[in-house]
């Protein structure tokens, strides 16, 4: 089979104006970025259509290092729905440069189920990530200047919370000292997070419009003064400057798939260190024009889907009609104690054992009132008997099941899934959304409910620093914010080596971060870092420009 990049280059793309016209977007509302990419102003959002049309979430079982192919399922389903005559639109996240040059090598789907132009999407795209990085670091520079000027005054800063960000994987930047050298500012310990972990990214993806963006940016807490008063962006009077840097980026990006299905790609927080969903604005824009809108939440259902429901849907008033859990036989075997290098070998017993991981995710999604369909991503190593084993297991539980072969066959390979999705939404759509916790619950109650009900933890403990921060948040009257857990994506627990469905484990909250602008409380567990490092063999060594063509992206 051809490589992803070969398939992408051979695809016959339509001009983006034609894609927009097919959706019913007036040409006055198409802002071209070349021939095949455009921005669409969020002013086109029609709330009546948003409520009427069908939102579908794609999530997954606990992933292997290679992933489960969730984006391939999302794009494949959009292709399959269009294949059977439905008006489908994908609403996905933008890839981060860090993982593209690190482990993943790209995040635009795969095979014959890709969003295009793949090279542009995976690299700089429309500059949204650069705008977010610039906005975040502009705040850093202006706050450092404020700190420098406020020395020796009643406004002097005692505690600095705000770091810097870059869209790279660079472990050397996790802890740094700034201000060294005479006349170079105030010496302080600081660090860098990756751009998808930036609070600006979270705000960008949760804001409903430019004024909401401004309000949230103004409310970001940067640090505390000598009298322990919170210092916010609005105290510096710089929110206008930051909004100016984001005024174009806030509009969602329109592209197309390998079969010219429209897709909005906008925003890109990770689900292990942030809330893991594309922008509310892009999702609502897609729902304005698409009868069926397929979106996804990062990593597995315990991370991305929980945050999608408890944070994004809670705040945006969204109510999905269906949740799809993507799985692979290889991923299930890994949860049945097969080493990752051997998951391509037939092993029915390990597959049966690994189904417990799928069952736990199904159980969790039902807690949110969701109707569930399982989409098994077909790989070249799959054998029919193992596919049937998973099918029969799902059917015995009353859960819909379909094989997705869009990677190899495009939309044709997702027709079975598309037909099942339409039938399920028509006959048994999800119930009104339920949440794991209530706004009025205490911070520890919220964290406890997520850890015990969704992850299956036996207990939750807190470091002294976490306890201290929880008390400070409660005293500030912000305890009603939703909780965003930062933990490993490779296990229900905070230990990435505990596969399957571990029990009896303890979760430790190492730190608590208040994101007062994005209005969420981040609970950091285990060894989770908000700035990833590079692997021993990064994808960057395979990326090159050959005769004007990019090689090594996938």
Swiss-Prot record:
GO biological process assignments: tetrahydrofolate interconversion
Enzyme class, spelled out: ligase
Pathway assigned in UniProt: One-carbon metabolism; tetrahydrofolate interconversion
Keywords: ATP-binding, Ligase, Nucleotide-binding, One-carbon metabolism
Intrachain disulfide bonds: none
InterPro entries: Formate_THF_ligase (IPR000559), Formate_THF_ligase_CS (IPR020628), P-loop_NTPase (IPR027417)
Assigned protein family: Belongs to the formate--tetrahydrofolate ligase family.
Enzyme Commission number(s) of this protein: 6.3.4.3
Sequence intervals crossing the membrane: none
Protein name: Formate--tetrahydrofolate ligase
Keyword Ligase assigned: yes
GO MF annotation: an example: ATP binding
Keyword Nucleotide-binding: yes
Catalytic activity: (6S)-5,6,7,8-tetrahydrofolate + formate + ATP = (6R)-10-formyltetrahydrofolate + ADP + phosphate
Organism domain of life: Bacteria
CDD domains documented for this protein: FTHFS
Residues that coordinate or bind ATP: 64-71
